[in-house]
Amino acid sequence: MEFREQVLDLLTEVAENNVIKENPDVELFEEGIFDSFQTVGLLLEIQNKLDIEVSIMDFDRDEWATPNKIVEVLEELR
């Protein structure tokens, strides 16, 4: 499976919302799709399933605002 698809699947799973795959430019926080608890869960899932460590200190809400932006950040980190 392609890395981008893995990330989108992970985001969809954590958010419990298919809009992520339908619109990868959706604003996750502005639209209320992600909250702080889901963000922490996402960071844990990224570490567990993708073997990429992201600390909460590295998390920047603007850089992680959309699924596409998250894919870009994670591609740089892996």
UniProtKB/Swiss-Prot annotation:
GO terms for cellular component: cytoplasm. The keyword Cell wall biogenesis/degradation applies. PROSITE patterns: CARRIER (PS50075). Disulfide bonds: none annotated. It comes from the Bacteria. Residues 1-78 form the Carrier domain. 4'-phosphopantetheine is transferred from CoA to a specific serine of apo-DCP. The keyword DNA damage does not apply. InterPro entries: ACP-like_sf (IPR036736), DltC (IPR003230), PP-bd_ACP (IPR009081). One of its GO terms (biological process) is lipoteichoic acid biosynthetic process. Pathway: Cell wall biogenesis; lipoteichoic acid biosynthesis. It is found in: Cytoplasm. It holds the Pfam family PP-binding. One of its GO terms (molecular function) is D-alanyl carrier activity. Its main location: cytoplasm. The modification O-(pantetheine 4'-phosphoryl)serine is found at S36. Keywords: Cell wall biogenesis/degradation, Cytoplasm, Phosphopantetheine, Phosphoprotein. NCBIfam families: dltC, PRK05087.1. Carrier protein involved in the D-alanylation of lipoteichoic acid (LTA). The loading of thioester-linked D-alanine onto DltC is catalyzed by D-alanine--D-alanyl carrier protein ligase DltA. The DltC-carried D-alanyl group is further transferred to cell membrane phosphatidylglycerol (PG) by forming an ester bond, probably catalyzed by DltD. D-alanylation of LTA plays an important role in modulating the properties of the cell wall in Gram-positive bacteria, influencing the net charge of the cell wall. Belongs to the DltC family. This is D-alanyl carrier protein. The gene is dltC.
